[in-house]
Swiss-Prot record:
Pfam families: Oxidored_q3
Cellular component terms per the entry's GO annotation: mitochondrial membrane
Stated role: Core subunit of the mitochondrial membrane respiratory chain NADH dehydrogenase (Complex I) that is believed to belong to the minimal assembly required for catalysis. Complex I functions in the transfer of electrons from NADH to the respiratory chain. The immediate electron acceptor for the enzyme is believed to be ubiquinone.
Record's catalysed reaction(s): a ubiquinone + NADH + 5 H(+)(in) = a ubiquinol + NAD(+) + 4 H(+)(out)
The protein, known as: NADH-ubiquinone oxidoreductase chain 6
InterPro entries registered for this protein in UniProt: ComplexI_Subunit6 (IPR050269), NADH_UbQ/plastoQ_OxRdtase_su6 (IPR001457), Nuo/plastoQ_OxRdtase_6_NuoJ (IPR042106)
GO molecular function: NADH dehydrogenase (ubiquinone) activity
Taxonomy, superkingdom: Eukaryota
Family: Belongs to the complex I subunit 6 family.
Length: 173
């Protein structure tokens, strides 16, 4: 089970490095989807199944708006991919920086500082995200509906701004 959690965390770090290496917005959005998936996998592995589902859906809804906006503003004939030389060099630079810090801390500390603690206590019996579900549907339902409405409104505004044939506000840029 530790190997699966390590795989999720490795995918999370590699996805964050891929986002930070500044590829074209198309590939940056794809990397963000991977980061969201691996981050929600970490939450699921710690028992927050409903919380990870809600975060994944809300995050992907917000990313849809950001992706539509950035793809409309940065339409390039030859986008920088994750395999082009400048992006790969920055990617490996970040990768070796992150794992260099990890290796340095492992050598200097000589102890396992990344271990998960408290998994076998009584805290593992109680499901914290289920308390959040009851609060969300009782007193937090209005905020949930407001968030969904704002995301829908933002999506419609972005789609109106990037409408084709020169009628959109940002096509003249």
């Amino acid at each position: 089970m530790t190997y699966v959690m390590s795989l999720f965390l490795l995918g999370l770090v590699l996805g964050l490095v891929a986002v930070a290496s500044n590829p074209s917005p198309y590939f940056g959005a794809l990397s963000l989807v991977g980061v969201a998936a691996f981050g929600c996998g970490v939450l699921i592995w710690h028992g927050g199944s409903f919380l990870s589902l809600v975060l994944f859906l809300i995050y992907l809804g917000g990313m849809l708006v950001v992706f539509a906006y950035s793809a409309a503003l940065a339409a390039e004939p030859y986008p920088e991919t994750l395999g082009s030389w400048p992006v790969v060099s920055v990617y490996f630079g970040y990768f070796f920086f992150v794992f260099g810090i990890l290796y340095t801390n492992m050598v200097l500390d000589e102890e396992v500082w990344w271990g998960v603690s408290g998994e076998m206590d009584w805290d593992a019996v109680f499901r914290g995200d289920m308390d959040g579900v009851s609060l969300m549907y009782s007193s937090g339902g209005g905020v949930l509906l407001l968030g969904a409405w704002v995301l829908l409104l933002t999506l419609l505004v972005v789609l109106e701004l990037v409408r084709g044939l020169g009628r959109g506000a940002l096509r003249a840029v």
